[in-house]
Each structure stands twice: as C-alpha cells, then as structure tokens.
A protein has these predicted regions:
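Short, small/polar-rich loop/turn modules that mediate ligand/substrate recognition or access, typified
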Residues: 173, 178, 233-235, 241
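Substrate-binding pocket helix/loop in short-chain dehydrogenase/reductase
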Residues: 97-98, 102-110, 192, 203
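Alpha-helical segment proximal to the catalytic Tyr-Lys
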Residues: 126, 170-174, 231
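Residue(s) in the substrate-gating loop at a strand-loop-helix junction
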Residues: 141
C-alpha cells in the first residue's frame, strides 16, 4: 500500500480540539503536513497545540467571525506558507421539530455549518490558485443525504455544503484544486458516549456493518482525499457510514 506523504503541505482544520476534528488533525500531522487546528476557546487551542507538538499549533477562531477568518488565512501564510489543505469540520447542531424551530435555531446552524464553510473556502482560494494546487475537504453528514426528523436546519446546511462543493469543484478544477465532501454516519465520539446501550443498539440496526465508526475512519478518508493519490477525484462525497446510507 502506498504511504501518504503530505510533507510540505499546510493544513487548516476547523473544530480540531476533540472528536473527528482532532483525529483529522493528528492524521494529517502524522503524514507530514504542518497543521493549524482551530477551537472556539483558548483552552481548546492550547489542547490542540499540545497534542500536535512540532506538527503544528492550535488557534482560536469563531468561524462566524468573517474578518477574523480572513485574517487567520493571512497569518498562516506569513508563518507557514499558503494553506494547501482546508478541512471544514467545525459545526453545530440545534435540533428541534420543524413546527417548534425558531428562526434563531435555523439561522445559527446555517451560519456555522454552511455560510462559514463557503467563507473559508473562498478565503484560501487565492493562495491555492497561485500555487496551482489545493485540496478543500468539507465534512458533511449522512443526514444531509438521508434526512432526519428534528434536524431540518442541520440537514439543509449539510446538503447545501455538498451542492456548494460540487459547484466550486467545477469552477476551480482547471487550477488543479479539488473539492470533496466526507459524510460520516454514526461515529463513536463524546456525543455517542452519553447514549444508553439500548439507544446504541437501535442506532446500529440501521448500520449493515453493525458497529459505530471511529473518528480515525473519517480521518483516514480525509488523509486519502488530501493525498496525491486522490488527485483525480473532485466534486464527490465519500460516505463513511458502515452502509447506513448507500447511493
């Protein structure tokens, strides 16, 4: 099997303090990339710096802060070079039945999970175009394809990211920049650890492989899409869900 080598690459991973984002940041650093991971708090950023060590650092970023997002891209370029791998992982949920959902619950999920993804993607384009290479990898969700009761806002945002990614892939493909999505299913994270055995058993009835995925499964998919081996893959969604959703 060919080993992934990302030496010389500069990766920005949002929402990297724990869970899937942490696994992604660690995997990219292991493959040789210089990784900048974001968190919403100073303590989260410090945790990222600690686990990355010489492989990169953590920074504080609210992805909804438009000015700060653009500033961060400039700061990374000055310190490490232009971002060559962007992983849009940061996201939130505010689940509610449609009839009870407030505009604020809709707006905040769309802002964080869709608008901010588009903003950061646009912000890294100049550097990628100048280098004539780049990887944009957006973490979506099985919910964006299958839907889920109580998650109308979340499903809309994640489906929107998939559509946006395809449009952007067509627009910038000639510059040797790929844009893809990874859609995780049920992944074993802090969130699933709060579920009862009965709840997990019910979830697993929907998964042909019969188990929860690991954050490392998603990280491996990101590593592949970031690698030279995936240079002819763009505008697609890679489903990492144990067969829960198939198309």
């Amino acid at each position: 099997m060919t080993t992934v080598d990302l030496s010389g690459q500069v990766a920005l991973v949002t929402g990297a303090s724990r869970g899937i984002g942490r696994a992604i940041a660690q995997e990219l650093a292991k493959q040789g990339a210089k990784v900048i991971g974001t968190a919403t708090s100073e303590s989260g950023a410090n945790a990222i710096s600690e686990y990355l060590g010489n492989g990169g650092k953590g920074v504080v970023l609210d992805v909804n802060d438009a000015a700060r997002s653009v500033e961060l891209i400039d700061e990374i370029q000055k310190e490490f070079g232009a971002v060559s791998i962007l992983v849009n992982n940061a996201g939130i949920t505010q689940d509610q039945l449609a009839m009870r959902m407030k505009d604020e619950e809709w707006d905040s999920v769309i802002a964080t999970n869709l608008t901010a993804v588009g903003r950061l993607s646009r912000a890294v384009l100049r550097g990628m175009m100048k280098a004539k290479t780049g990887r944009i990898i957006n973490i979506t969700s099985v919910v964006g394809s299958s839907g889920n009761a109580g998650q109308m806002n979340y499903a809309a945002a994640k489906a929107g990211v998939a559509g946006m990614s395809r449009a952007l892939a067509r627009e910038i493909g000639s510059r040797n920049i790929t844009v893809n999505c990874i859609a995780p299913g049920f992944i074993d994270t802090d969130m699933t650890k709060t579920l009862s055995e009965q709840q997990i058993a019910a979830l697993l009835q929907q998964v042909p492989l019969g188990r929860l995925g690991a954050a490392e499964d998603v990280a491996a998919a990101v590593s592949f899409l970031a690698s030279p081996q995936a240079s002819y893959i763009t505008g697609t969604t890679l489903h990492v869900n144990g067969g829960m959703y198939m198309n």
